[in-house]
Amino acid sequence: MTWRSLLIQNGGKLSLQRRQLLIQQNGESHTVPLEDIAVIIIENRETLITAPLLSALAEHGATLLTCDEQFLPCGQWLPYAQYHRQLKILKLQLNISEPLKKQLWQHIVRQKILNQAFVADETGNDLAAKRLRTLASEVRSGDTGNREAQAAALYFQALFGEKFTRNDNNAVNAALNYTYAVLRAAVARTLTLYGWLPALGLFHRSELNPFNLADDFIEPLRPLADLTVIHLYEQGRLKAELTPGIKQHLIKTLHYQISIERQHFSTLAAIDKMVSSFQAGVTDKNAKQLKLPEILPLKEYQYE
């Protein structure tokens, strides 16, 4: 199981040496086994990356993110055709019926709202948590009652104040956007490893979005990012610009402990479990087979 996430903040060169990632910076060299790497985030725009390394990362199922001038992830390198039965999965994906898509989306939205309720409880917003659990129980197939949007409005105002909106240009939204981007990349990576096309979503269907399916499956994980950010916010650690230390902290969301069916996993492992169960559910045409993560109090998963 891959478990490392790397943030490259200084210029230098990344290359392949004896099946390991070689990092050369400021006259020093470090190596990391490729089989340990899940995600690499390249923040420094002067970093050089060799083609053999990119090929080796793809072969090992690792994903690489590049960042824009605001140091937010803007591009992603994904493994291609790593699943041994690619055509089988493509046929499955193209033939998912509309009723099954709606049932799967119902489960996703319900778990997202339940996770939001947990975050509300963790932050002392008991009344909001109670209302969120009620909204979760009201989610219907396809979320025809739009309970997701109602929950979001209630949830964010409970966490960050009545005047807060996700469109505001502030430190909280910058931190949320950064963490969502990291989680989205991890979900997209796992989907491609299982042979799914990230562009073909269940609910998200924008023709301009190459990651619609990843945006479907990130939903129950968003509250994990929210809980991470609100802890930093309450501690007064969020500034107008995200510092290197804060980014390192936000990337830890990939390694926090979360639960699926009362078993504890790292976020990365839980994503794998979720995508694997999605495949089983689609194969058997049974949305109830989809296993979704439950948020726990923030604690790093202890790898064996």
From Swiss-Prot:
Gene3D superfamilies: CRISPR-associated endonuclease Cas1, C-terminal domain. One of its GO terms (molecular function) is DNA binding. Keywords: Antiviral defense, DNA-binding, Endonuclease, Hydrolase, Magnesium, Manganese, Metal-binding, Nuclease. InterPro entries: Cas1, CRISPR-assoc_Cas1, CRISPR-assoc_Cas1_C, CRISPR-assoc_Cas1_NMENI. The keyword Protease does not apply. Its EC number is 3.1.-.-. Disulfide bonds: none annotated. Homodimer, forms a heterotetramer with a Cas2 homodimer. Belongs to the CRISPR-associated endonuclease Cas1 family. CRISPR (clustered regularly interspaced short palindromic repeat), is an adaptive immune system that provides protection against mobile genetic elements (viruses, transposable elements and conjugative plasmids). CRISPR clusters contain spacers, sequences complementary to antecedent mobile elements, and target invading nucleic acids. CRISPR clusters are transcribed and processed into CRISPR RNA (crRNA). Acts as a dsDNA endonuclease. Involved in the integration of spacer DNA into the CRISPR cassette. PANTHER family: CRISPR-ASSOCIATED ENDONUCLEASE CAS1 1. This is CRISPR-associated endonuclease Cas1.
